[in-house]
Amino acid sequence: MGVTKYILKHPVTTVMALLCLVVFGISSVFSAKLEQMPDMETPMLIIMANYSGAGPEDISELVTEPIEEAIGTMEGVDTISSTSSDGRSMIMLQYDYGTDMDEAFDNLKQKLDNIQRALPDDVEPSVMSMNSNQGDSMMLSIAHKTQTNLYDYVDQKIVPELERISSIANIETRGGSSKYVSIELQSEKMDQYNLTMQDVASAISDANVASPSGEADAGNLELSVTTSLKTEQVNELQDIPIKTPAGQIISLSDVANVYEATKDRGGISRYNGQETISISIQKQQDSTDMEVSSAVKEKVEELMADDSDLTITVANDTSDTILDSLKDVAETMVLAVIISMFIIFLFFGDYKASLIVGSSIPTSILMSLIAITMAGFSLNVITMSALVLGVGMMVDNSIVVLESCFRATAEQEDKGALGYFSAALHGTGIVINSIIGSTITTCVVFLPLAFLNGMTGQMFKPLGFTIVFCMSASLLSAMTVVPLCYLFYKPSEAKRALMGRPIERLQKWYRGIMDRLLNHKAMVMGFSVLVLVLTVILASGMQTELMTSDDTGTVSVSIETRPGLKQEKIEEALAEAEAIVSASDQVDSYMLRYNGDSGEISAYLKDDRTMKTDDVADQWQKEMDNIANCTIDVSASTSMSFMGRQRGYEVILHGTQYDELKEVSDKIVKEMTARTDVINIHSSIENNAPIITLKVDPVMAKAYGLTASSIGTTLNQMLSGIDATTLKIDGEDITVTVEYPEGEYETVDNIKDIILTGTNGQKVALTDVANVVFEDSPASISRTDGAYEITISADYTGDNVQQQINSEVITPNLSGTISIGQNSRDRMMKSEFSSLYRAIAIAVFLVFVVMAAQFESVKFSIMVMTTIPFSLVGSFGLLKLTGVSISMTSLLGFLILVGTVVNNGILYVDTVNQYRSTMDLRTALIEAGATRIRPILMTSMTTILSMIPMALAIGSSGSTTQGLAIVDIGGLSVGVIVALFMVPVYYALLSRKPKEEIPDVD
């Protein structure tokens, strides 16, 4: 009351404060960071280790397992999972939430340094951190009209320019071939002079050096002396001297052909079917996609202005998606404001009343924006959606105050300025306790979110704080802006308001029906039990998912080819996949990037597409399942893609013995293939390929001074070549590679004919020290917490198939060492759902405590709390009706519902308590409902209708918060009925004759 009275007596001061609010609020919008999603730090570190030429089994044995053993006892590590593939080991460490990741990073680096000696010489593990916003910020396609060596041009001219941008963390180039100098050895000549590849590489390296040799005095100067033997032309390499083991000096040209050549550097890259060089750009963790986009586009314009033959196309820009998403949410918010003002007009019939509430909305939003910026939150889909939710909830307080002011005016005899002043002050005072109580109950439910450390806490903490900011701002607006505007505008309630007569008829009907219900309390209680039973029935069998995916209009086609597949077969598989993508009339453009044994097609769909992105992905998946020699997974890319997506059936088998696990997996796949209720059965080890394995005889090898490691290194050099040095020609750095002619060791017989040189210079055939055999090798080997795992997936052709497959196929094949495991997505869902369930339970308790303190009565608190369980029937029913599953956002909707659905009950019980001082209990129960039916309907309708645009999932990111809106719409709709018809009965049942008040001693 004191605040309201001060505001009414100092209007100029208030207006100036509001003006400052507008200025600082708008300023906060321009200074806020714009992002798709809140910046979430994933407590995960990834170890990458490359070992060229090693197969998955060797990688697992020599690299992955030693590292896993060393880091297995590290503090704070929750799960260790690894994938060993051809030439690469990737180990992911999932830490407990709340772990100091900087300290964890340092500890992990120290562990890796300690075991470096236990790893092969060429293996140098690297560690990188991960967060949810670490995807590609931009994708560029580069073409040039005149450059014949485009890869080197991009690598040496364009990439360095982009790397100067401070907001860029990483740049990856794909496609094209690079120029290099080939030192093509002649086998006969090498044998003639008894030389090895390493002899030639060392001679080339020694002939291209510059080293400091000290200092010398020259008069008054002290000059540095440098010894230089630099090769600057390709033809100069031919004259490099090489000393043979016999002491003879020969030239490089005597044993090798020297010429410029090209080789693939970045794999395959095509944009809309045309060969191109593609560049993917990742942002720094503390930067935004908007900053990266602006800086890159500016740099691209500079580069193209300097070179008219250069064309750089922005294939994908994440900032565009962010702006579109935020624009959609902003439009939804504006629509919610319009809906709220229209409802006010319907009930009061006076545009001034709509303006009063309309004035409080921007005031509350601006105060919230200032608070968001000060709290360090970004403007993203989550915080903007919170503002949309806030619009519906923040007008509740204003409506209650406005309706009370109208009622106070009707009771005033003075209709002049003094009368409006008194009505504004008195009307606000009557409901001040109710709006404070309802605001606190709404805000207090978000308190548990502040203590959640998991992904739920990181994602929804900004949403919770934003709604708290909105509700706090709305309370302040209701106590200040609404009374002041009421005094200034002097609105009058129209006698012929559109909802005037319907409300009067509704009040009359309510009095009659409530009079009957109070005579049939047992019937109401029986109906209550039926509602609870229906709630349980609706809740059972609901589909669950971690997070509803948004529709960004991007489809990701992940392609994994069989290891060792010939280049022409790879091209055939890629061409088939490209043909399916390019033939779709939904596609605007697409980018293919392939390297090693895997690649991806990123398809960017048209804005005016007629199909949902998920539907396009499902259609392509069916068409691509028949492409030979590869495994293809098609999915819709979303802002939450790091959470993964499950399509159809999936089971993960865990076992300690790989051979046994593989045998069981093959048997399960065979049995599933024979069934008709599943199709497209795939196994994570199905891309097996035969490899050539050298089984070294340690005794024979030692006799010639050889080891398995030295033999492996020699073969790797002979098959892959040695990078001996680098030349700078015409300003370009060109690698000099010592290699044998292409096809020299293409067949197994060629490899068997290799002659090795022992440490004593003695020659020995490879087959004398090792057996060359064929073995079946998996494309990759996966492990989780030390146990091997194989994933089997399939698509359903019928209903209720999962339980049948588990009972008829999976369970009978399990043994003592093999079990069913959970993937990371399922583990995450279980953990995050548990956290949200606890948060909801704590929120219910806090709401109970707040209301008990507000009413100074546990009894009244219990009465109002009954609205919570009964409102769930509306939430589950609407979820079932719309086909929306239970997800993190829908569970958050239940959390919000706990704090909002009780507001009508609070208003009703507070009014009954006021009326009981002048009325009997029965009359007070009936008249309180009839009197408050209008504000209850107004506040509920504004909240519910303002959420409808969000429930319709309008815009690309609309589906992210759709479940939240549906839960609240259904719950609040039923909550109105509970507050008006069931709470009065509970009040009557729990009411007792009040105890005699103890008089004050004073």
Locations of the language-model features?
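Helix-loop junctions and hydrophobic alpha-helical segments within the transmembrane domains
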Residues: 315, 322, 326, 402, ...
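Signature of alpha-helical transmembrane segments and their immediate interfacial
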Residues: 1-34, 429-431, 452, 484, ...
